[in-house]
Amino acid sequence: FVFLGMFLAFIAINICVPFAGIYAALEEAVVNILERVWGIITTPASREGEENWRSLLRYFIGYTVLFVVMAVLIFLPYILQNKTLIWEADGLGQYVPKVYRFIQYIPEIFKDIFSGNFDFKQYDFTTGLGATVAISYDPVYWLYLLFSPAKIEKAYSFLIIVRYFLAGLSMSGLVLYFKKSHFAAYTASIVYAFSGYAIYAGTKHGQFLTPMILLPILVVAMERLIRNRKWYMLTVLVGVSLLCSYYFLYMNTIALGIYFVLRIVCTEEYRNWKTFFERGFIIVGSYILGASLGVISLFTSFGSYMGS
């Protein structure tokens, strides 16, 4: 299914290229309609950033359309065969049952909090021979709370697609941060979101798309630190990354380390020891502070390992 979907996507890319002009005209027409609606509900004083808003809106519409087309083509075999993205090995045996327990446990926590009971359930005897209650700090994972238990299987597949969308959108933010064209951002985001690794790993382990979502915005945060010594964004994202998974954070940290070294070495403005060590110390401090924000995930993870 996956390789057939990738083949269909390759054909679609080659077919769509000659129609880029038609697509641009349609994109412009949609943006003009939305701008008229925007002009009705806002005042002139509130439209100071109109050009920037127009550009971002045009890009977001274009990216969304491209993503939907590519997603339909890639996952068409699943749709035709009435299949879900639940892998029969880990997905059916681990991930979906964990989601069921999660959407049952979180409401219970809030009920206990509002009733003044802080003696939370910490162990679940209905999981195999018994296990600690698993809580995910991944923001996307919490979207499962929007679905009823009867819809979890469909929600599982839907949120995997959402992760693909967010991965491409994250790459879009990186490309646009460097002031590249919309075409460059479209190309990079679609190729990134539907890369071989993303298709292969994401359809089996949806959480493996989380580091793909975080990496591009971590690079943006690193770039802001290198250029302007602004470390706040990197600190927050390190904390969020650690909350999602310490494993994903350390893998992304390796990529960020390589990026930092190459950025310093390949940029004449920063190619000196003073800048290298100065920015390096700021990064280390930012990482320590960010890790402090997300350290609760380490306690819960290693607590589970030590008690298993």
Task: Indicate residue ranges for each PLM-predicted region.
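Membrane-embedded helix bundles of polyisoprenyl
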Residues: 67, 165-177, 182-266, 279-302, ...
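Start-transfer (signal-anchor) and selected internal transmembrane alpha helices
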Residues: 2-77, 278-283
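Structural signal for the C-terminal ends of transmembrane alpha-helices
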Residues: 12-25, 75-76, 178-179, 221-227, ...
